[in-house]
Amino acid sequence: MERDEYQLPNSHGKNTFLSRIFGLQSDEVNPSLNSQEMSNFPLPDIERGSSLLHSTNDSREDVDENDLRVPESDQGTSTEEEDEVDEEQVQAYAPQISDGLDGDHQLNSVTSKENVLETEKSNLERLVEGSTDDSVPKVGQLSSEEEEDNEFINNDGFDDDTPLFQKSKIHEFSSKKSNTIEDGKRPLFFRHILQNNRPQRDTQKLFTSSNAIHHDKDKSANNGPRNINGNQKHGTKYFGSATQPRFTGSPLNNTNRFTKLFPLRKPNLLSNISVLNNTPEDRINTLSVKERALWKWANVENLDIFLQDVYNYYLGNGFYCIILEKILNICTLLFVVFVSTYMGHCVDYSKLPTSHRVSDIIIDKCYSNSITGFTKFFLWMFYFFVILKIVQLYFDVQKLSELQNFYKYLLNISDDELQTLPWQNVIQQLMYLKDQNAMTANVVEVKAKNRIDAHDVANRIMRRENYLIALYNSDILNLSLPIPLFRTNVLTKTLEWNINLCVMGFVFNESGFIKQSILKPSQREFTREELQKRFMLAGFLNIILAPFLVTYFVLLYFFRYFNEYKTSPGSIGARQYTPIAEWKFREYNELYHIFKKRISLSTTLANKYVDQFPKEKTNLFLKFVSFICGSFVAILAFLTVFDPENFLNFEITSDRSVIFYITILGAIWSVSRNTITQEYHVFDPEETLKELYEYTHYLPKEWEGRYHKEEIKLEFCKLYNLRIVILLRELTSLMITPFVLWFSLPSSAGRIVDFFRENSEYVDGLGYVCKYAMFNMKNIDGEDTHSMDEDSLTKKIAVNGSHTLNSKRRSKFTAEDHSDKDLANNKMLQSYVYFMDDYSNSENLTGKYQLPAKKGYPNNEGDSFLNNKYSWRKQFQPGQKPELFRIGKHALGPGHNISPAIYSTRNPGKNWDNNNNGDDIKNGTNNATAKNDDNNGNNDHEYVLTESFLDSGAFPNHDVIDHNKMLNSNYNGNGILNKGGVLGLVKEYYKKSDVGR
């Protein structure tokens, strides 16, 4: 028999732990507990001195306000059916102001449950009667306007930056309440996902009522998401509940490789936990490990910090990996300081030429005799710092142990699985845990706990990072100095760390919410001045710490990279992305491990693009340097043969022997020789950059049509610079950063404050977040964006089970240079597309170190792509076809048509025979594309060939004949290939005078 969920609250002050865990719908708890204890909690006392809280009815003031209770949460699991139940629960406890202020409680009650609603309504009216406005619990951070209205209410128990109560009008209770953003504010495709991915109530889950078992089973059979063609979509559901199947595929393909590789196991909560009901915080150590993990989850006070810890645990690959990394970091610090101190004060270098043992050059009692005064003081400071790091490690071990128990017992994920498990699976397990009605003890986080999905979790984890992405892309920071060589904005890791400390530490409070003073226009001048003072103070501290930081990082970089450059001199030309490039490339709500994998995969293509451009001037200079250095090394080595024992110690200059110069000159020769480019590359920068865009997501509109030009390459190299240059900038930045903080950044303080005020958006349950991270399409102005309907947007971003977004779709989101607002909106649209691709496409569900399984092309002869490196001998060997080496990405083998417009892999033999026999190229193209049957089981692909720089200003328009004339020297201009074939081409080639040079 089902118990009544709505009972009158009583005054028994029990610790209702079960209400935080299992909510209103639990059927497996101890029957001795009253169900009202599981659905209510005491409202904190509000100061009765306010006129808002006085009632005109004297009899109601005699009742103890501690008995006044409001619902802790609407125990919905994000389904449409349960949202209706949520509405009934909210209305059951919502104050009916229209009737309460007049004392009229006549409701059209026809059931006993409605009578309970009337009684609860009258109880809550004691709090608000006598006022024209009412207060209801509000989840998350209060908006700045609402806080100004309620400033006269003194809530000592709550943080000023995270108020609990909000004013609301009566019509807000007549409409349906939701835990998420209103559907009208959701992006179009988000609404499509949320409407179609409404999860079904899982009838097998623990502690849930079974009154809708048959209804849910019937509905779940016909409620799978479908794509625009009407077929069931093969994708993942990370928006809503997790109690439904993780993938929904077609009936022909019910099995999925991801469900086999990463089987999901629902959290196995305790079936009898009545012992936890009266357990206070100071006695949780008496509980078992699993019970303690459940208690911790139920008493989460700050969901932002908790989810960030959960993600950092996943990012660190578990308990032992994180602890090992922290210990090794301390050991690295100790090693650098100990070795540098010992080598500087405990070795007598004057005895090196005459000594043969280490003991002969060691200074006895060097720490007491040689190290004195200033150096010893800083050594003691360093020892104290190491002790603090060890103490911090002790507390980190306790915290990580709790996270390990949370993963192991509540999410059913072991540490061994974290290295291969996709983050999407962790999100899915969190949603399972949420759907089992686990609540928080903090009323501010009640509804926030029910807002756990991929989008909201990413917003909580990246609340600060999203602001930083928008900040660095807006170019409002002045990072230059009014002196030569430093007039350009250069961001380094040192400067980035200081900006994060000064700006983000000032804007956000300890709870992780943005401060209300930042959002109030009336306090703009005050916040601007405070931020300026913060910049100047940070600059002063950097000046004091600069000598020690420079010394430490010089030694660290020397120990880390010297052996690499010594053994592999060619690595000195290695490149990496600059810090500003990483912030420009990163998308909103893109977690770090996804971004890191994407950027790491792009380095090969980035090197390919840079290496395509000739470096003749550099090569000539390096050849000369290598010749000079090699000559001196050869002379010294030759002279060493006559007297190897004495000549090696012969001093060429003061205190510089032959060995010294052989070592230095040999290193210079090796570096210069390995840097000279001696290989041939296909010059196709346009195709390479467009392919690189698939990983960097960065292709400015200004570059269009100029991909082959040197200035575009130089602009790209500013983002993808030499590693040695970046290291030198980092060392220089340690001395330049104090002046940037003191002179340059204070002038940007006003724009920074305006940026946070103008780009913050309030979301119920989340607080203030960066507006671009919410993917709200209504914020976009312009006719082009408003004209996008749901179908067109879905076509751009919808993905099925085996195909990801291709370059033609993604290139539509390239930033346009109409205005800064257009750039920001385009960045938001682009982030939205890739966010949906990361979480909706099953092909992207991989671990941190794994690549998605792409369907490759047939491994037949002639189907491989064009090689970047080839020799003339290979190109012109007998029987070789010169079309294989044409300009472009795709090789022309038997499976490709040589038409420069469109070619297909369908019917490859006929295409190649027609073209090789001299048939009309256009006819060959038509034959290749005539049978375009989507139901063909073969892997047929159709490509649009793009030319490198042929579409630029130098070559405005080229038709098919022009392309064939350019790419085939035997083309006669009539669409026919000459019968001279390869021999004729070789004959023409060897007529040139420069052959063999």
From Swiss-Prot:
What are its GO cellular component terms? autophagosome; cytoplasmic vesicle membrane; endoplasmic reticulum membrane; Golgi membrane; mitochondrial membrane; mitochondrion; phagophore; phagophore assembly site
Q: Which InterPro entries match?
A: Autophagy-rel_prot_9
Q: Changing residue 192 to L does what?
A: Abolishes interaction with ATG11 and disrupts Cvt, but not bulk autophagy
Intramembrane region coordinates: 539-559, 724-744
Q: Where is this cross-link: Glycyl lysine isopeptide (Lys-Gly) (interchain with G-Cter in ubiquitin)?
A: 113, 121, 138, 701
Q: Does the keyword Transmembrane helix apply?
A: yes
Q: What is the effect of changing residue 138 to R?
A: Abolished ubiquitination by the SCF(MET30) complex and subsequent degradation
For the region Disordered, what residue ranges are annotated? 29-88, 128-159, 213-235
Membrane topology annotation:
Multi-pass membrane protein
Purpose of the protein? Phospholipid scramblase involved in autophagy and cytoplasm to vacuole transport (Cvt) vesicle formation. Cycles between the preautophagosomal structure/phagophore assembly site (PAS) and the cytoplasmic vesicle pool and supplies membrane for the growing autophagosome. Lipid scramblase activity plays a key role in preautophagosomal structure/phagophore assembly by distributing the phospholipids that arrive through ATG2 from the cytoplasmic to the luminal leaflet of the bilayer, thereby driving autophagosomal membrane expansion. Required for mitophagy.
**Family of the protein in this entry:** Belongs to the ATG9 family.
* Protein name according to UniProt: Autophagy-related protein 9
Organism whose genome encodes this protein: Saccharomyces cerevisiae (strain ATCC 204508 / S288c) (Baker's yeast)
**Which gene codes for it?**
ATG9
